[in-house]
């Protein structure tokens, strides 16, 4: 170790040395370099390339002492470059401060490199050393830094540094409050150590730095980032998760303790400096808009390219979708597409490397603002962007903290960022819109992502609530911005049905879309950030969620955003004088979200929609949508229905039909319009909605969303059509509508009642689709939704929707909410399976008529079909979501699936049957039977009593055969000492086989194993003819599909056995 010199480090590939060093450090460095190096600066210097010995030995001392120095170093651009330029030697002179400083400087360099924020020189300088470090191994420290940084970031160097560093880290932890470091693997420690060296973490810092860097808008720095990110991404993905967990936690403690100089004396200042830099950078609106926009475009393009490489099709799709929507927008938002694309790539990048993901993500966030800056008001937004970057930086920090601190920290950070954002929103509505919407999007995303991360429902639920509450506040603040709505709309569009949604949205209003897109990157970025924060794994979901937004995000972001989008779309549509369609769509949309928004007058809603929806509707609707998200069915129902409905507005029939699940998403805009249209009712319902969120669990008949929105008609027609359709589904769907209808019944006219019914119907189908993604985040959203709903004033219509989700349980039969749910899932599913097509067609048809027919006529006509079909769709959707696990039809599906899967199994069984030994070895379902049959030759008679019995068992049922199979399996697998033992297994085995359900097919095969005649039957077993030897098997042969699935089950069982 000590023998290694800077020259050696430079000469030899640092990674190899690091690899060796890792081993050495693991064993020796912890003891030797730690103590000796602390005393001897020379060894430290030598170890500096190793980073562990150097930085640890020096940093344990220095970091405590130099923590301030680190911040100072960060503050002093020259010192960092000097350190870099000096390399380890220059630092050696100042060993204690130098080494730590050096280490810190390297981190700072990396940080600056990423953060080039207020130090463009340092950034570029650092950037040169950084990139050059790879090429230039002149500075072993730098080289190590790059390699170690990337590796550290980090695979090869990370653990090595971690080893020595961990011991060092104990003091470091003391000084840095990085206690988690110990608990975290050396990798985490080293990563954080890097972070600490770089004031606590390049990761935590990078969160700021990416954003800052972007704001600094130094393409070179961005390029270096991209390069590092690329390498890091490669290394990071495997290690990213562990690193992320450790680093994030480590970084989080540092960040959390960042506030305390003790823990992160240097990191705090560094972060503060970074933030200050960001603020300063942001302070220069012109610089920001120019630098940010250009760098974003360039660096983001690079990142986007790299990230897109990762994202690939997704990014391309998003780009294409964005581009499609962007035709008009592209001019205003040339940089926005890269930003948005970058956002998606950022997400992808985020997945591989969360810490660094923060960089791209935050960069994405910054670019959206920056992009928005040019579009909105570069100067205005620039300062706002400065503020937002701070808040975003905090958000980034919060996100970094989030993994360790958990979503609450992120929420707190988000809250702070929101507060800051809100301030800008007060001063700058545009920024607020963008920022607020991103925050909201982030909130929902966080909720969704959180929900996904944890149990998607557990963590998301608890955490989502605060976030969404915050979101509620933001929404209240945000209600004014239409751009927010547009943003939400755009975001939703991307996530939901990228092409379809974009097309629909674009038709609605490209201007809106343009603004939306500009704003949209922020939410998307936030989404990426949130996704990143939550976890690499979660990030993947997040990607899916974010671009698709249907599975997970749709609940929150999609619904909330969709609501905004739909609202905006509705506004635009109305502006486009699509009032008629909108009215019909509104009817449909309102049907989709029956409780959501049934205003006394659809037309009125359409008219007011553009006015009020912006103020109340968008935020309130968002809240309600979130609330809906909280309620599983209604949430997505609302979101989906809204989007779909919005699509319907664009192409009422075509879009709705095209996207049956999303079909009802657009109702949210229309709902919004209507609740807003019924401003008084909306307000009333707002108060009610507020109450309703509180009573969300009981929202069955609270008439929370103002009696206006829901009507008995809605209830009656919704429940009656649905009820006949399918009692459970009808109960749930109808119950929701009925509850809301009861509320809305009061003020609404009959026409609106129809609309309500209609809305209710879409709402239910929507809720069903929502269930898929909804279940994860639904609980979380529910909690958060309540606060959000409370906050939202115009959430009346949405509140009902939100309420609806829970109402399904407490619907018509409040006494049997659970039963309703279950029944809805099962019988409703079964009924829905039948009415599935009908409901889809009906919904589509209804949607089409809605678009064509005025609210009143269409409402009544459509309401009935929609109510029943929609509900069926809802139940159906629910069924589908469980993967048709609930509906009886789903059972057939399962069997079919099993059959499809089992077919290969049968083949494999046959091939394996080739040898008795193989068959015995393969206890799998049918194979087991074959084995058993072979066993049967020797044992079957005792076990089954006789081959005839075996045949009879299949006749008796798959279970019987299964039991036999299991028994045989036991024999074949364990070759139970005695037939009695085998016989005993069947009791348990039978139960197991029951799950297999159709192991009889294997029995045919096993008989084949037993005797030539049976073997013949066995091959036939695949075909119905296998009955030749086994009558029972013949029957099974008839149900060959079942056999195969059963066989699979059997095989699985045996494997477990």
Curated annotation (Swiss-Prot):
GO terms for molecular function: microtubule binding; microtubule stabilizing activity. Tau/MAP repeats lie at residues 897-927, 928-958, 959-990. Disulfide bonds: none annotated. It is found in: Cytoplasm, Cytoskeleton; Cytoplasm, Cytoskeleton, Microtubule organizing center. InterPro entries: MAP2/MAP4/Tau (IPR027324), MAP_tubulin-bd_rpt (IPR001084). The modification Phosphoserine is found at residues 5, 60, 99, 254, 257, 417, 509, 515, 520, 522, 599, 618, 668, 685, 695, 761, 799, 801, 827, 902, 915, 978, 1050, 1056. It comes from the Eukaryota. PROSITE patterns: TAU_MAP_1, TAU_MAP_2. The keyword Cell membrane does not apply. The keyword Cytoplasm applies. It comes from Rattus norvegicus (Rat). This is Microtubule-associated protein 4. Residues 262-272, 729-742, 785-812, 847-857, 1010-1036 have a biased composition (Low complexity). Residues 53-67, 743-760, 813-822 have a biased composition (Basic and acidic residues). GO terms for cellular component: axon; axoneme; microtubule; microtubule organizing center; mitotic spindle; neuron projection; postsynaptic density.
């Amino acid at each position: 170790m000590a023998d290694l010199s800077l020259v050696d480090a430079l000469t030899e590939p640092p990674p190899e040395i690091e690899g060796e060093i890792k081993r050495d450090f693991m064993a020796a460095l912890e003891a030797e370099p730690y103590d000796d190096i602390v005393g001897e600066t020379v060894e430290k210097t030598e170890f500096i390339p190793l980073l562990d010995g150097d930085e640890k030995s020096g940093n344990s001392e220095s970091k405590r002492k130099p923590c301030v120095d680190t911040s100072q170093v960060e503050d002093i651009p020259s010192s960092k470059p000097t350190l870099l330029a000096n390399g380890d030697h220059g630092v050696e002179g100042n060993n204690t401060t130098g080494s730590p400083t050096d280490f810190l400087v390297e981190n700072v360099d990396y940080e600056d490199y990423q953060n080039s924020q207020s130090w463009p020189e340092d950034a570029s300088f650092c950037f040169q050393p950084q990139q050059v470090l790879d090429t230039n191994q002149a500075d072993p420290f730098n080289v190590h830094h790059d390699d170690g940084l990337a590796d550290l970031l980090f695979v090869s160097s990370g653990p090595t540094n971690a080893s020595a560093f961990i011991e060092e880290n104990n003091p470091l932890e003391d000084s840095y409050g990085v206690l988690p470091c110990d608990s975290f693997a050396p990798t985490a420690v080293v990563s954080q150590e890097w972070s600490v060296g770089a004031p606590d973490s390049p990761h935590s810092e990078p969160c700021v730095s990416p954003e800052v860097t972007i704001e600094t808008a130094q393409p070179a720095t961005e390029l270096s980032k991209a390069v590092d990110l690329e390498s890091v991404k490669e290394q990071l993905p495997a290690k990213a998760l562990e690193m992320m967990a450790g680093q994030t936690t480590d970084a989080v403690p540092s960040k959390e303790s960042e506030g305390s100089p003790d823990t992160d004396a240097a990191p705090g200042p560094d972060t503060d400096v970074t933030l200050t830099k960001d603020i300063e950078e942001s302070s220069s609106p012109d610089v920001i808009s120019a630098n940010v926009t250009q760098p974003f475009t360039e660096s983001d393009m690079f990142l986007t390219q790299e990230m897109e490489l990762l994202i690939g099709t997704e990014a391309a799709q998003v780009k294409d979708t964005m581009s499609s929507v962007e035709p008009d927008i592209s001019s205003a938002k040339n940089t926005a597409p890269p930003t948005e694309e970058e956002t998606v790539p950022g997400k992808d990048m985020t997945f591989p490397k969360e810490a660094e993901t923060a960089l791209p993500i935050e960069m994405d966030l910054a670019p959206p603002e920056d992009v928005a800056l040019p579009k909105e008001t570069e100067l205005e937004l620039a300062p706002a962007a400065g503020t937002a970057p701070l808040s975003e930086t905090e958000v980034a920090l919060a996100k970094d903290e989030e993994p360790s601190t958990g979503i609450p920290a992120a929420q707190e950070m988000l809250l702070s960022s929101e507060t800051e954002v809100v301030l800008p929103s007060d001063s700058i509505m545009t920024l607020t819109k963008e920022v607020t919407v991103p925050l909201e999007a982030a909130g929902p995303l966080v909720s969704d992502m959180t929900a996904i991360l944890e149990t998607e429902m557990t963590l998301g639920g608890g955490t989502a609530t605060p976030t969404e509450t915050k979101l509620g506040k933001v929404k209240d603040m945000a209600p004014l911005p239409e751009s927010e709505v547009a943003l939400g709309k755009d975001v939703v569009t991307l996530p939901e049905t990228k092409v379809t949604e974009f097309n629909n949205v674009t038709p609605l209003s490209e201007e809106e879309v343009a603004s939306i897109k500009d704003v949209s990157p922020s939410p998307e970025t936030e989404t990426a950030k949130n996704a990143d924060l939550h976890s690499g794994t979660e990030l993947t979901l997040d990607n899916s969620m974010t671009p698709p937004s249907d599975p997970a995000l749709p609940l929150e972001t999609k619904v909330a955003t969709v609501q905004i989008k739909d609202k905006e779309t509705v506004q635009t549509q109305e502006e486009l004088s699509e009032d008629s369609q909108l009215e019909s769509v509104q009817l449909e949309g309102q049907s989709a979200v029956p409780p959501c928004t049934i205003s006394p007058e659809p037309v009125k809603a359409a008219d007011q929609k553009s006015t009020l929806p912006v103020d109340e509707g968008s935020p309130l609707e968002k809240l309600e949508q979130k609330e809906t998200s909280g309620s599983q069915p209604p949430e997505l129902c609302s979101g989906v229905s809204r989007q779909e409905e919005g699509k319907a507005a664009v192409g009422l029939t075509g879009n709705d039909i095209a996207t049956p699940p999303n079909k009802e998403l657009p109702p949210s805009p229309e709902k919004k319009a209507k609740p807003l249209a019924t401003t008084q009712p909306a307000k009333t319902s707002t108060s009610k909605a507020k109450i309703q969120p509180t009573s969300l669990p009981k929202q069955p008949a609270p008439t929370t969303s103002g009696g206006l929105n829901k009507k008995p008609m809605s209830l009656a027609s919704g429940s009656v059509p649905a009820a006949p359709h399918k009692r459970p589904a009808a109960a749930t769907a109808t119950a929701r509508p009925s509850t809301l209808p009861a509320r809305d019944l009061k003020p609404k006219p009959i026409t609106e009642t129809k609309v309500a019914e209609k809305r209710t119907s879409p709402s239910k189908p929507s809720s069903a689709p929502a269930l898929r993604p909804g279940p994860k985040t639904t609980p979380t959203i529910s909690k958060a939704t309540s606060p959000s709903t409370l906050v939202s004033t115009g959430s009346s219509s949405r509140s009902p929707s939100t309420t609806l989700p829970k109402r399904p349980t407490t619907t018509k039969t409040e006494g049997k909410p659970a039963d309703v749910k279950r029944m809805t899932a099962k019988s409703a599913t079964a009924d829905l399976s039948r009415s599935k097509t009908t409901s889809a067609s009906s919904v589509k048809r209804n949607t089409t008529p809605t678009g064509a027919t005025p609210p009143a006529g269409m409402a009544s006509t459509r309401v009935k079909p929609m109510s029943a079909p929609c509900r069926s769709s809802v139940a159906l959707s629910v069924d589908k979501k469980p993967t048709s696990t609930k509906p009886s039809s789903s059972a057939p599906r399962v069997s079919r699936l099993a059959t499809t899967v089992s077919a290969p199994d049968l083949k494999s069984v046959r091939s394996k049957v080739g040898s008795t030994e193989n068959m015995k070895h393969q206890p799998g379902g049918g194979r087991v039977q074959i084995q058993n049959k072979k066993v049967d030759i020797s044992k079957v008679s005792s076990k089954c009593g006789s081959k005839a019995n075996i045949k009879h068992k299949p006749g008796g049922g798959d279970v019987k055969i299964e039991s036999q199979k299991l028994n045989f399996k036991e024999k074949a697998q364990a070759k139970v000492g005695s037939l009695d033992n085998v016989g005993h297994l069947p009791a348990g085995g039978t139960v197991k086989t029951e799950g297999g359900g159709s192991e009889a097919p294997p029995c045919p095969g096993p008989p084949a194993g037993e005797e030539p005649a049976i073997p013949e039957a066995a091959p036939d077993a695949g075909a119905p003819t296998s009955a030749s030897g086994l009558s029972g098997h013949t029957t099974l042969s008839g149900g060959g599909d079942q056999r195969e699935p059963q066989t699979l089950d059997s095989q699985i069982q045996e494997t477990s056995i």
